[in-house]
């Protein structure tokens, strides 16, 4: 999804499909070791379906529809976010490229679990997080915007999807991750990370679904929701 927060750049990509197989190949190609972690579909928010998701869950990606109401809420949230201080251990970046939210969501996920997984030495992900470690969220966004390797890899992942991609996407990815005992919502279109209270690696998935249920309740008539868990391979 491309919005006002991305207006600093005229660059637009095609949106990434919410498809765990596509995302796995994408991440593994960028330097996440295949035996370290993988993306899995979450088929529903009931306890029985959540139990089917491979554990431990390291991060969650959520795709939801952009509406007038959600945009108004985002603007209001930004006013509050700017006044709050979050842990400097949270890896957060802005989104300046249209329709790059899938890639941004994956980078938010990996960037906040680097202590739990191994990245291949010298790979894109290894170099990206080392290069951007001390940057501001906007500097990270610009670094990504100017990197042709990730743009090419994103394009390949888009083509690998099961459905044709349209530039006029009306859905958006966010990431939910646990950092230092807190559940954070990471959305590059917002002013910064949003804390949703206490969490832990053991309860991350259930804690994230509580946040997600509230988001779904605000748009009950839509079916354009999708949830993907990034799980540690054991």
From Swiss-Prot:
Gene3D superfamilies referenced in this protein's UniProt entry, alphabetically: Peptidase C12, ubiquitin carboxyl-terminal hydrolase
Site residues by UniProt (Important for enzyme activity): 187
Keyword Hydrolase: yes
Enzyme class (EC, first level): hydrolase
One Gene Ontology term from the biological process aspect of the record: ubiquitin-dependent protein catabolic process
Domain of life according to the entry: Eukaryota
GO MF annotations, alphabetized: cysteine-type deubiquitinase activity
Gene symbol of the encoding locus: UCH3
Record keywords, A-Z: Hydrolase, Protease, Thiol protease, Ubl conjugation pathway
Protein name as annotated: Ubiquitin carboxyl-terminal hydrolase 3
Similarity comment text for this entry: Belongs to the peptidase C12 family.
Site for Transition state stabilizer, residues: 95
């Amino acid at each position: 999804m491309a919005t006002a927060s991305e207006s600093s750049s005229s660059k637009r990509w095609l949106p990434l499909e919410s498809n765990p197989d596509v995302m796995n190949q994408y991440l593994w190609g960028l330097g996440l070791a295949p035996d370290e972690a993988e993306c899995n579909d979450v088929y529903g928010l009931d306890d029985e379906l959540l139990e089917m998701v491979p554990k431990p869950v390291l991060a969650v990606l959520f795709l939801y529809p952009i509406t007038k109401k959600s945009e108004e809420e985002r603007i209001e949230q930004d006013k509050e976010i700017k006044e709050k201080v979050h842990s400097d251990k949270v890896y957060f970046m802005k989104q300046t490229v249209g329709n790059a939210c899938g890639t941004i969501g994956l980078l938010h996920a990996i960037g906040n679990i680097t202590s739990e997984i191994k990245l291949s030495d010298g790979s894109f992900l290894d170099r990206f997080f080392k290069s951007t470690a001390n940057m501001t969220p906007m500097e990270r966004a610009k670094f990504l915007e100017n990197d042709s390797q990730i743009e090419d890899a994103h394009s390949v992942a888009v083509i690998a999807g099961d459905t044709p991609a349209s530039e006029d996407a009306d859905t958006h990815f966010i990431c939910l991750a646990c950092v230092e005992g807190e559940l954070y919502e990471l959305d590059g279109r917002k002013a910064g990370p949003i804390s949703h209270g206490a969490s832990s690696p053991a309860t991350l998935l259930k804690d994230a679904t509580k946040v997600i249920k509230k988001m779904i309740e605000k748009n009950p008539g839509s079916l354009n929701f999708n949830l993907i868990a990034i799980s540690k391979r054991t």
